[in-house]
Amino acid sequence: MKKYQIAVAGTGYVGLSIATLLAQHNPVKAVDIIPEKGEMINQRISPIQDEYIEKYFAEKELDLVATLDAEAAYKDADFVVVAAPTNYDSRKNFFDTSAVEKVIALVMQYNPDAIIVIKSTIPVGYTESIRQKTGNPNILFSPEYQRESKALYDTLYPSRIIVGRPEGDERLEEAAHTFAQLLVQGAIGKSQGNTPEANSELRTHNSELNKGIPLLFMG
């Protein structure tokens, strides 16, 4: 599989686990606004508590560079993975998606042709609404199912990989399949923790098996 230039916005549990997974086979630039986190990542010291990230930092040859320079990270990226925080306000029943939107705006400024993949937790219907709001169709959504301190493990052994994309656009259909294959390429295999109910649910979708991992592409 060819190598792709990848940028990851955010180095929390989701962002750093995805960056680590993808950096096994592709050049990855991880963007954060906190200098100390970037310095730690470049020294292969995990800024978060995660046994598998620490293990991969110590043992794997990762093509991973952390940077504060969003332009340098985004301008040549084929894919930009957005893992910015979206804090939930239970009183207002509201996800703060402003950090996600700032990343999207920067990507559109520096590299309007890049495929943007949102990994942040977002409200239902948000991806389509942000496509319409920005006029940018190149926005996909790929939800994460991760536990804190087990984020990379859950990324290496996913129960499923889901990529949402607009229907009827062959280029974005291809981009969604390519991104899913990048995740499969870095993964080890399917989680064994699925319930029979979950497996039954997965069979109702048009799934493909890769390393035993179901891939679901949704409009």
Residue ranges and their predicted role:
Residues 1-219:
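Structural/interface elements that position substrates and couple domains in central-metabolism enzymes
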